[in-house]
Amino acid sequence: MATPVRMKDKYNREVVPRLQEQFNYTNLMQVPKISKIVINRGLGEASQNAKALDGSIAEVARIAGQKPVVTRAKKAIAGFKLRAGVPVGVTVTLRARRMYEFLDRLVSVALPRIRDFRGVSPKAFDGRGNYTLGLREQLIFPEIEYDSVDKIRGMDITICTTAKTDEEGRALLAALGMPFRK
């Protein structure tokens, strides 16, 4: 049997009872939980530079622990010198065990490594309890070696929850250890 994931264990033991008491849920299934985490990286230069795409795929795969999918342009846009079908980014969706492992690494290791870090914005919710976090550099993850990086690139991390409101989503992420700015 596999060892339990630390973040999942914390959710079941501490977070569920706390949220059930805070929001007066009568049923355990009403308590919000994280359904998936999506990591997305747009690559503007990928249409001209295929090497940038390969490097980005390798980096996101190392960070997420799972191979990303290449996203392609749906239609041509002359102003951006873009043709339909040209690679424009990479995305990966994490669920279950990998999702909890990634969230644990993000909260406890990666975010504290950001320079001048004072917490993440509490306003980045979408109105339905989902949270999106933009990172400016990939070097905050310990899986990425400084020497192997050709260019500093950011990424978007979306944490999708089953929460109905932003308040519930914020309470869930705060209970899991997300460091929100005061």
Curated annotation (Swiss-Prot):
InterPro entries xref list: Ribosomal_uL5 (IPR002132), Ribosomal_uL5_bac-type (IPR020930), Ribosomal_uL5_C (IPR031309), Ribosomal_uL5_CS (IPR020929), Ribosomal_uL5_dom_sf (IPR022803), Ribosomal_uL5_N (IPR031310)
UniProt keyword annotation of RNA-binding present: yes
GO cellular component, one term: cytosolic large ribosomal subunit
An example molecular function term from Gene Ontology annotations: tRNA binding
UniProt keyword annotations, A-Z: Ribonucleoprotein, Ribosomal protein, RNA-binding, rRNA-binding, tRNA-binding
GO BP annotations listed: translation
Top-level taxonomic group: Bacteria
Family annotation (Pfam families): Ribosomal_L5, Ribosomal_L5_C
Functional note: This is one of the proteins that bind and probably mediate the attachment of the 5S RNA into the large ribosomal subunit, where it forms part of the central protuberance. In the 70S ribosome it contacts protein S13 of the 30S subunit (bridge B1b), connecting the 2 subunits; this bridge is implicated in subunit movement. Contacts the P site tRNA; the 5S rRNA and some of its associated proteins might help stabilize positioning of ribosome-bound tRNAs.
Alphabetized PANTHER family for the sequence: 60S RIBOSOMAL PROTEIN L11-RELATED
Family note: Belongs to the universal ribosomal protein uL5 family.
Subunit comment: Part of the 50S ribosomal subunit; part of the 5S rRNA/L5/L18/L25 subcomplex. Contacts the 5S rRNA and the P site tRNA. Forms a bridge to the 30S subunit in the 70S ribosome.
Protein name: Large ribosomal subunit protein uL5
Gene source species: Gloeobacter violaceus (strain ATCC 29082 / PCC 7421)
